[in-house]
Amino acid sequence: MAHVAEWKKKEVEELANLIKSYPVVALVDVSSMPAYPLSQMRRLIRENNGLLRVSRNTLIELAIKKVAQELGKPELEKLINYIEGGAGILVTTMNPFKLYKFLQQNRQPAPAKPGAKVPKDVVIPAGPTSLAPGPIVGQMQAMGIPARIERGKVTIQKDTVVLKAGEEITPELANILNALGIQPLEVGLDLLAVYEDGIIYTPDVLAIDESEYINMLQKAYMHAFNLAVNIAYPTPQTIEAIIQKAFLNAKAVAVEAGYITKETISDIIGRAIRAMLLLAQQLPEDVLDEKTKELLSAQAQVSVAQVEEEKKEEKVEEEKEDEEASEEEALAGLSALFG
């Protein structure tokens, strides 16, 4: 039987103790991080109630198996399926979604490297650069970058997208980007998987659009609220709206029945006046008193104003329809012209 070095046994034991001490256990790939950014990340993780421990993949695997068996957590052992690259164990009190967001927010820009794939579109902005005239101008122009010399400096004529997200950096483009001081890459801890309460989360699950989910929750709340109000289901959130709805319904019934209260009297009188004016319109003018004539005149003026407003709205709609028809005719003409 091969002898196992004491330091390996000790390392596995320490890793196992870390895993036992925190509710959330994550695997991260640290292989892309230089030493200094990695030390900064360690500090940030400590400040946010967590610890990062980098070790050999085989020792991490042994530690996870050990804890899974000791605590009777078979799902935890499945975490070893995600070990790859230069793995490290990150233990924390942050839930998996907050952890993913934390790691994404703390990624840092890095210089261009030939063969590396960019995480997002790379744009060379328009304007003067710090570069002096030289062969780089021709190199830029050969790659479709509109560069020229102005006032003794290389100037970019317009914003130019030189790489789309996911595309590889060529050696020639890497030289240009580095000369311009553009850092198209990112370095950070790459999350491989996270374990919490018997569930393993992968990055694709954790990468959610917060604004979209907040909007969905708001809509769901409003639908539930409206349903609860409509079926008169009282809760601290709906009771006020239910009472208001009941009051308005009761008031409408009372007004319809002519039942006089301090809440209904003005509506009942208003309803009676409208009925009276409707009747007065059918009578000869010489039998009406002056007050009734004034009311009828005021009502007529309001009606005329409403009709004029409706005509304006109809005219605007007709103009819009004419514009749309003209556009359709123009498109039809072009189609006929070009077959």
UniProtKB/Swiss-Prot annotation:
Keyword tags: Ribonucleoprotein, Ribosomal protein, RNA-binding, rRNA-binding
Molecular-function GO terms, alphabetical: large ribosomal subunit rRNA binding; structural constituent of ribosome
Keyword ATP-binding: no
GO cellular component, as recorded: cytosolic large ribosomal subunit
Cleavable signal peptide: none
Pfam families in the record: Ribosomal_L10, RL10P_insert
Region (Disordered): 307-339
Residue ranges, compositional bias (Basic and acidic residues): 308-318
Biased composition (Acidic residues): 319-330
GO biological process: cytoplasmic translation; ribosomal large subunit assembly
InterPro entries membership: Ribosomal_protein_uL10, Ribosomal_uL10, Ribosomal_uL10-like_insert, Ribosomal_uL10-like_insert_sf, Ribosomal_uL10-like_sf, Ribosomal_uL10_arc
Membrane is among the record's keywords: no
Assembly and oligomerization: Part of the 50S ribosomal subunit. Forms part of the ribosomal stalk which helps the ribosome interact with GTP-bound translation factors. Forms a heptameric L10(L12)2(L12)2(L12)2 complex, where L10 forms an elongated spine to which the L12 dimers bind in a sequential fashion.
Function: Forms part of the ribosomal stalk, playing a central role in the interaction of the ribosome with GTP-bound translation factors.
Family: Belongs to the universal ribosomal protein uL10 family.
Protein name: Large ribosomal subunit protein uL10
Originating gene: rpl10
